[in-house]
């Protein structure tokens, strides 16, 4: 037994209970000279090798049969590069000693990470292939300040936590280690003795790729190259741009018919992207693609926030999909979930044995609706983890926008909680001040760092200023989903037309608050699940009336101020609710031309017409862009308004929400002349009754509705028509 190392230290190191392996392992100056120590379980012989010559400088003595070796290098006083020749099971291997390398994280990075102000923490934390002192390998870093010991385990060390214990940087709570020879494509995890003395295996919070469920290991892979957002993509996100979003769940848009298996990212690039382009959509919105263990969460309970799910392929396959969308002229929106995370033991929950990422009090840290945990936004490192993630998807994948899920659950402490189940903020209020500051900070940083990318909020309350700048007291989002408009209009449309006259305000109320936010009008995945029925099936009447109602509603929606969002399947009037375990009902479009084809053609024409006419999108958030012409004809359920562009060009939109055609319907207009019908949801092209106005109508100098000139139209039954004024 050597007198240079205490037996208790060796025992603790081998047992995995020693927190400072670099103080023991590697090369050290002692009174006897330079001593090299190594923990190499199952090794039988170890020599210190001079790399340049390959000469054996010293044989290390086995001080413990469990694999602890030590030896003094004669006639050497200064540290030098060395390798170890190790014999395992009769086979000699030449390795570089991980414990001869100095600290990995620079002092400035460590300080910024501790302060929570490192814009790109993913460039430092996680697993990064690197070359140090001429040696190729991978540097690993993980934040676990309360763990007693952390080791890297993986395919490079037989998943043995004794072999690669990490160095703790006490000033930041980060553990680090460079492992020579570990390379891209290998699986790894962190094995730790947590704050309570329990042995845990954890996935890397900053892993750039991960295994597909049910496996949970992280994957070493390089940081993706940055993607520059083009000027065209920036313009496509602006307030005056036409934005028509096709919301998609990649796992159920279409599946292989022979085995019901998912399409890959590359197959989706070849099928989904050209379809969305052909349909005239401007944006693809993807339900969360972060790695997640439970298919039924649709991705909204992510465990790998930095890793695209392997369900559909590799990280590079996903980048291929994004590139294909951009090449087709489609911007890509990613659903982003910074509001909560699942309780799975391999992920963030009680990461180092303490409530590291979540609040410790369940009244703050547990979401009973979803059985998930809530991030502690007041903890700087946690907020930094999330802000960095937002920047990561935009900078490294070319994502054009983030749609933030469940904002209301973040900004209200009493969200879905009864009295006594929540804790007021420091001022006694119900607002989650830390979450509000986190959202403002995220939006501010994205605006500064990736100008042109935007964020959208799914916020279900009337919290003021969601899409207003921070200096105005807002949250700083660019857009907000108008869930009130969605609920009101769907409630109206499901009524039998005979009762709609008593609920006329459900269609007009939206304009009373339209300019308080920058709204997106969403018919999202949430509206076609959990017994709500499909959008088509909510419409009243027989089959003909259901389809007519739906077409009229779409015509109304595409004309109403606000950007558009339609969940997949609704574009061809799928009749059943969405099922995430199966393909959309594409068979409805097989065979002869039918009502489903008609709705699909209508949505395509709506998109292309909406994009072509600036009046339909240029002034969504400016009162000049909208004017009621007929707002009070509730007895006949008729509504008529004007959309207007910056130059004053107008489009008239007229809707008749009863099955009774309205002949010779006169109303006042602003601009006399010939008005051409550019869209009629009752057209035979869409399988309607083909009532209309022969393609065009001339105005009369007959006063109506307080205006000198007027039009006399036929308003088709259960239909919306658009008219544009012909140039003189």
UniProtKB/Swiss-Prot annotation:
Pfam families: Alpha-amylase (PF00128), Alpha-amylase_C (PF02806), CBM_48 (PF02922), GlgB_N (PF22019). Gene3D superfamilies: Glycosidases, Golgi alpha-mannosidase II, Immunoglobulins. Disulfide bonds: none annotated. The keyword Cytoplasm does not apply. One of its GO terms (cellular component) is cytosol. Keywords: Carbohydrate metabolism, Glycogen biosynthesis, Glycogen metabolism, Glycosyltransferase, Transferase. Pathway: Glycan biosynthesis; glycogen biosynthesis. Its EC number is 2.4.1.18. The active site is at 405 (nucleophile), 458 (proton donor). Transmembrane segments: none annotated. GO terms for molecular function: 1,4-alpha-glucan branching enzyme activity; cation binding; hydrolase activity, hydrolyzing O-glycosyl compounds. It comes from the Bacteria. It is an enzyme of class 2 (transferase). It catalyses: Transfers a segment of a (1->4)-alpha-D-glucan chain to a primary hydroxy group in a similar glucan chain. GO terms for biological process: glycogen biosynthetic process. Monomer. Belongs to the glycosyl hydrolase 13 family. GlgB subfamily. Catalyzes the formation of the alpha-1,6-glucosidic linkages in glycogen by scission of a 1,4-alpha-linked oligosaccharide from growing alpha-1,4-glucan chains and the subsequent attachment of the oligosaccharide to the alpha-1,6 position. HAMAP family: GlgB. This is 1,4-alpha-glucan branching enzyme GlgB.
């Amino acid at each position: 037994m050597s007198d240079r190392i205490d037996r208790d230290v060796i025992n603790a190191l081998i047992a995995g209970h020693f927190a400072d392996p670099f103080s023991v392992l590697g090369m050290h100056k002692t009174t006897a000279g330079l001593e090299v120590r190594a923990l190499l379980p199952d090794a039988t012989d170890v020599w210190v090798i001079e790399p340049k010559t390959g000469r054996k400088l010293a044989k290390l003595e086995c001080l413990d049969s469990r694999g602890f070796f030590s030896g003094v290098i004669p006639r050497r006083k200064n540290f030098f590069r060395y390798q170890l020749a190790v014999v395992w099971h009769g086979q000699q291997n030449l390795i570089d000693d991980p414990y001869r390398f100095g600290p990995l994280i620079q002092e400035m990075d460590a300080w910024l990470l501790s302060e929570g102000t490192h814009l790109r923490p993913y460039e430092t934390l996680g697993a990064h292939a690197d070359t140090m002192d001429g040696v190729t390998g991978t540097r690993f870093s993980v934040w676990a300040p309360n763990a007693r010991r952390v080791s890297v385990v993986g395919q490079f060390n037989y998943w043995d936590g004794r072999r690669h214990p990490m160095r703790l940087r006490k000033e930041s709570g980060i553990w680090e280690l460079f492992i020579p020879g570990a390379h891209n494509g290998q699986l790894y995890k962190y094995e730790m003795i947590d704050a309570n003395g329990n042995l845990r295996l954890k996935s890397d919070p900053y892993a750039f790729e991960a295994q597909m469920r049910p496996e949970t290991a992280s994957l070493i892979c390089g940081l993706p190259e940055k993607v520059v957002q083009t000027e065209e993509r920036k313009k496509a996100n602006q307030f005056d741009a036409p934005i028509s979003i096709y919301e998609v769940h990649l796992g159920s848009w279409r599946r292989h018919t022979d085995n019901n298996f998912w399409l890959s990212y590359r197959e989706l690039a070849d099928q989904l992207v050209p379809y969305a382009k052909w349909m005239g959509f401007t944006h693809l919105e993807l339900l969360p693609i972060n790695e997640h263990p439970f298919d039924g969460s649709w991705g909204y309970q992510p465990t790998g926030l930095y890793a695209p799910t392997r369900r559909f392929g590799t990280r590079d396959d996903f980048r291929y999909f994004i590139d294909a969308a951009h090449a087709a002229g489609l911007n890509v929106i990613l659903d982003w979930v910074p509001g909560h995370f699942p309780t799975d033991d391999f992920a963030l929950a009680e990461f180092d044995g303490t409530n590291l990422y979540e609040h410790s009090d369940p009244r703050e840290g547990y979401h009973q609706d979803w059985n998930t945990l809530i991030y502690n936004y007041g903890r700087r490192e946690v907020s930094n983890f999330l802000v960095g993630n937002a920047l990561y998807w935009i900078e490294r994948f070319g994502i054009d926008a983030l749609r933030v899920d469940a904002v209301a659950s973040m900004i209200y402490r009493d969200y879905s909680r009864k009295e006594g189940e929540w804790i007021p903020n420091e001022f006694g209020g119900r607002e989650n001040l830390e979450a509000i500051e986190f959202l403002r900070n995220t939006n501010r940083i994205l605006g500064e760092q990736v100008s042109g990318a935007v964020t959208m909020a799914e916020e279900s309350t009337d919290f003021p200023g969601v899409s207003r700048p921070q200096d105005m007291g807002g949250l700083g989002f660019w857009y907000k989903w108008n869930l009130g408009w969605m609920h009101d209009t769907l409630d109206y449309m499901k009524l039998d037309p005979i009762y709609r006259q008593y609920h006329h305000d459900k269609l007009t109320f939206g304009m009373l608050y339209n300019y308080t936010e920058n709204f997106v009008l969403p018919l999202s995945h949430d509206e076609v699940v959990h017994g709500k029925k499909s959008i088509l099936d909510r419409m009243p009447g027989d089959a003909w009336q259901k389809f007519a109602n739906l077409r009229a509603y779409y015509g109304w929606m595409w004309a109403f101020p606000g950007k558009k969002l339609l969940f997949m399947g609704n574009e061809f009037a799928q009749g059943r609710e969405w099922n995430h375990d199966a393909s959309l009902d594409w068979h409805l479009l097989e065979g002869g031309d039918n009502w489903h084809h008609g709705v699909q053609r209508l949505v395509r024409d709506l998109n292309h017409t909406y994009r072509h006419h600036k009046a339909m999108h240029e002034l969504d958030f400016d009162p000049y862009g909208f004017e009621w012409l007929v707002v009070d004809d509730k007895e006949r359920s008729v509504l008529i308004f004007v959309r207007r562009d910056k130059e004053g060009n107008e489009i008239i939109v007229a809707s008749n929400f009863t099955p009774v055609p309205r002949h010779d319907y006169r109303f006042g207009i602003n601009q006399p002349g010939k008005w051409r019908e550019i869209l009629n949801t009752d057209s035979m092209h869409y399988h309607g009754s083909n009532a209309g106005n022969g393609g065009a109508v001339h105005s009369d100098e007959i006063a109506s509705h307080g205006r000198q000139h007027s039009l006399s139209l036929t308003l088709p039954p259960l239909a919306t028509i658009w008219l544009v004024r012909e140039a003189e």
